[in-house]
């Protein structure tokens, strides 16, 4: 079982709270590149913060081909489940809402539920989304 102190320490950083918010909003596995694009942060920073959250028992990681997908470990402990419920109600500030909107745009680029794009800039995200919509039409 994960120690409560480790869980709370891991959440004592704005970037890690923003990452947890992405998981709560998406309610699905996310790859590092999707999170990096949504938060406009470099991949190495996202990876560093994901490692801390994973070490605290908040996240699970699963390799699928080229990408590693992360998800919230909702089964770890009753404390963690309760904490995630509280966070989902209170992480709605403007920054968190903007992050969730960017993530939704980025997830729209998935094919068959998988990340196929890698790291891109925000302007490229919009361009790729339009191209994908045009191909479907």
Predicted regions and their residues:
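Amphipathic alpha-helical dimerization/coiled-coil segments
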Residues: 2, 78-137
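N-terminal helix-turn-helix DNA-binding core of bacterial DNA-binding proteins
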Residues: 2-44, 67-75
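A structural preference for long, well-packed, hydrophobic secondary-structure segments
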Residues: 14, 25, 52-55, 72, ...
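A general structural signal for well-ordered secondary-structure junctions
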Residues: 14-17, 29, 59, 109-113
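Alpha-helical residues within the helix-turn-helix
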Residues: 37, 48, 54-55
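Intrinsically disordered, low-complexity linker/tail regions enriched in Pro/Ser/Thr
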Residues: 49-50, 60
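Beta-hairpin "wing" of winged helix-turn-helix
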Residues: 55-64, 71-73
């Amino acid at each position: 079982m994960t120690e409560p102190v480790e869980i709370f320490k891991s959440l004592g950083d704005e970037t890690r709270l923003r990452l947890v918010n992405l998981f709560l909003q998406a309610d699905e596995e996310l790859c590092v590149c999707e999170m990096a694009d949504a938060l406009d942060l470099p991949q190495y920073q996202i990876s560093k913060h994901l490692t801390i959250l994973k070490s605290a028992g908040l996240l699970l990681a699963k390799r699928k081909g080229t990408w590693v997908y992360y998800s919230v470990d909702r089964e770890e402990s009753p404390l963690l489940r309760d904490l995630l419920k509280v966070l989902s109600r209170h992480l709605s500030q403007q920054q968190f809402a903007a992050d969730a909107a960017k993530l939704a745009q980025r997830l729209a680029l998935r094919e068959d539920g998988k990340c196929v794009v890698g790291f891109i800039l925000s302007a490229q995200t919009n361009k790729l989304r339009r191209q994908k919509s045009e191909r479907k039409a």
